[in-house]
């Protein structure tokens, strides 16, 4: 046989063998991938489903029921995708693993949270919807005009992204909340007092006015705001001496859950005023439950330990005190108020707290029944800018 022809045949045989091996490898890889996907699918379907994520502090999406209506309106596929993501096997471990990889390659952000110096986690602020913000401010101005005989104050608290701007990663893009605060101040100042606590918080940043792992201010931050606004609130001689109690050293907040970074724990403290004989009790109006303290101890055994203040948010809470001075304070609030209100207790005969997100009754009627003399709007800026419930509540009262 011609040697050249033989070499060509040998070459063709080798190519055929390589081609068959390549096809076999492809089949094996495809089979292996199918087995892996099948195993993961079965594990995801068979492992114990969770209703709530302790780490993320939120309710998880359950697998939806398949109905013709849910298929037609698209809700079935939407909920199914959310359920696959929420119920994924070992989800918390995958989130933590992703964060570690991101940090190794220099990422300074995780799921909308900046990973900042000194182990601080700071939520990335969003620019407000001008229409939503304008609607809220208009409702507040109309409410103030209707009740111009009352002492009315707005305290819109800047978030850590503004107060602790120096802690953000270098060149990190972040919406400047200072412009939003200016807009709010300009809108409200003609019709009510405006308590700007930005400088008071900035002055004590290194003392810890925000939690490292949570979006709330600390009890110290709340005290700094109280001290800066007391005169504006009509408190002539505010208490300056407190005994500070440590409630827990193991608080991991919502930003640790959201980012997946669990490398720090926060301390929650309570400030006990000294030199006052004013006593009080708390009434949770929706349940008619009474309590002798604003602090709910069992909350310290839960994931969301910040709910030690009043047990979290409620539609309506009343604090009745022995300060027989006729001052009745109505507060429209979010959760920032929960750690602020304890500082107000010695100075009012009654404090009425409304969380508009959960309150649906007639505010006007409530104000008349309680004989309200003072009103305070207390929100953090991020919540306030996106909130629609306050305008609805005030609109119902107008």
Question: Where is each model-derived feature located?
Answer:
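Extracellular glycan-modifying ectodomains
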Residues: 1-398
